[in-house]
Structure formats: C-alpha cells, structure tokens
C-alpha cells in the first residue's frame, strides 16, 4: 500500500493513488493536470521515507476534477437587551483533485 502525506492549499493530507480529495480552491481549470511537490512523508510498500521538511524527488500527479462549494457555515451574533441581531453565512470554494500517481 502506497500512501503519502502532502502539504497543499495550506493543509496537510494523507493521500493514496486512485482516490479524490477536496482542497481549498486552486486556480486551475477542470481537466488539467497539476504536480504537487511538497511531500512530507512517503510509505511505499512498508518502506517509510520521512522528509525534513520535504522529500526531494517525489512528486504527486493529480487531475482537477471540478470546482465546488463546501457546506454552508452559519454565524449568528446577538447582543442581549438590544435589538442587535446579525446572521451571516459562508461557503468555502473547494477544488476536487483525483490523485493519478505517486512517483519517487
């Protein structure tokens, strides 16, 4: 089982080949391939390689599947004994990536 821990879009992810993951928005058109190079840990058939901080020569090839929006988060502020009520919502822009290959 090959997996890697990478840093992309300001978050660290545990990834495997052939699976898709949702990351913060990446400004790339759907259908295009991108290469993720910040690999922090690589496990290839039980052989673990740990980077300090990143591993040289290991790349992750991924394809952008689509752009989407995350679940709505609602924020409600209120001041007691006043008529102050504030309700706001936020939906995060996300990018769905399909991991094609992990090469070392």
Curated annotation (Swiss-Prot):
The keyword Ribosomal protein is annotated on this UniProt entry: yes
SUPFAM superfamilies for this protein: L21p-like
Any one Gene Ontology BP term: translation
Pfam families in the record, alphabetically? Ribosomal_L21p
Q: Name one GO molecular function term.
A: rRNA binding
Record's family? Belongs to the bacterial ribosomal protein bL21 family.
Protein name, entry field: Large ribosomal subunit protein bL21c
Question: Native species of this protein?
Answer: Pyropia yezoensis
Lineage of the organism: Eukaryota, Rhodophyta, Bangiophyceae, Bangiales, Bangiaceae
